[in-house]
């Protein structure tokens, strides 16, 4: 009996160490950033069982077999659609400003399509204004409405949008709504999904959370885009979820969420529509390519039109493109660079690009919320402040609520707005969208918004920062070490 017990014990110990060795080897063989690999190895060797389970659940990018097959299957038809779109030469920009040219060329080479011109663009900073404009557009819709959001929180004006969407569906408008399962959990546990489906709206719960499949698909891979397309002519995107700030996370202690959205008219709606169609096919298996270019796209030739490029990320989309776009934008800056983000946990490359810009004389400012709804990210962000301040970067802490806007402005001419946070999750994991806009007029509008944010912020004093308590420094370094995993 003792011999059997001893044998089982030795086999268990051997299996335990073989499991650790196997996972270690898998981490080392995967092409990933060194800080990320080191952080995973530390967790696994300090808390082996917890670390191994965590790594198998969220350590690698698993879209899931069914979705991965759909992603592969959709590309031939998507590529053909893009080639057909290229025949509409009048919608594509032939040249860009000197500051935007490198980024637009990068996007064209990697996505197979140039930036589109002739778009009308309106920047919106008040949630009420966004929802009122959206309700008007829904009421005037003639053919189709597509929406995707990370969060749809019932209550307030979000319910008015839902009512207008159901009214549109009842009068024959084809309405599709895709919401992230985790972000919109309150919505899916409310009466709204059934009400909408009964009205004729196609409602899809994207990347459904299923603990039984935790090792088959990465559960923290989320659908983080916020997009609306109406009649393949009007489009919205930005940082705002479908929530009324007066009813959203009021007990979080961070104040109301401050967002930014862009309302657009023109060919950009078609460029965003193909992104939506890819997401829809990956999730449902149904192909809904936008109408052919000769039916959908009007010959916009206004001199006042904006040139815009869409940058999409996520499984099935060009790998690392949003990260490359941010690096390109930072290195293109000659006069000033202003970045706004709620979550700042950058890659080493992006941090280096930001600091290098400041060190070569560019006026660099980063605007972050003083209070954050994520304690982990809040502490991890602080770990980067010393290096930023030493390089000459101005760090502003916004005090008027949770600043949720994601924006970048380069030399007043190249603007980036969308859903991308400056953290690892947005850069390399989630389904995201960013608009790159090459236009001085829009740059001036964005600069005015950012100036307003700065006026409601406190500039971090480098001397006072260096005098912060020791316990804060220890906490920052601890969270910094695990920042590649956040």
UniProtKB/Swiss-Prot annotation:
GO terms for cellular component: plasma membrane. It catalyses: 2 a 1,2-diacyl-sn-glycero-3-phospho-(1'-sn-glycerol) = a cardiolipin + glycerol. The chain crosses the membrane at residues 3-23, 38-58. One of its GO terms (molecular function) is cardiolipin synthase activity. The active site is at 224, 226, 231, 404, 406, 411. One of its GO terms (biological process) is cardiolipin biosynthetic process. Keywords: Cell inner membrane, Cell membrane, Lipid biosynthesis, Lipid metabolism, Membrane, Phospholipid biosynthesis, Phospholipid metabolism, Repeat, Transferase, Transmembrane, Transmembrane helix. It is an enzyme of class 2 (transferase). This is Cardiolipin synthase A. It comes from Escherichia coli O157:H7. The gene is clsA.
